[in-house]
Amino acid sequence: MCLGIPGQVVEVGKTITENALVDVCGVKREVNIALVCEGEPDTMIGKWVLVHVGFAMSIVNEQEAQETLNALMAMGEVEDDVSAFLYGEESTAKRA
């Protein structure tokens, strides 16, 4: 099963071959946007994408992104693996 985590593109490189910075629950992650970028990379700033293993796999609207994040946060309250992915590896250490 693949799990796509919603994040908002906050910074991009000059070309789509450069990674973008995507905000996932306050954690900035480097993400490759080449699969979803149609045109200039700066048009991606502010868009929500589903991220899987460092790649933006699709563009989603903000409502869908927020609903998915809310569901994942609820899962993270009982599943350390989900929480670690959303908030970074150190989150499980803090909870232990």
From Swiss-Prot:
GO terms for biological process: protein maturation. It comes from the Bacteria. Transmembrane segments: none annotated. Gene3D superfamilies: 2.30.30.140, 6.10.250.910. InterPro entries: Hydgase_assmbl_chp_CS, Hydrogenase_HupF/HypC. GO terms for molecular function: carbon dioxide binding; iron ion binding. Belongs to the HupF/HypC family. This is Frd operon uncharacterized protein C. It comes from Proteus vulgaris. The lineage of its organism: Bacteria, Pseudomonadati, Pseudomonadota, Gammaproteobacteria, Enterobacterales.
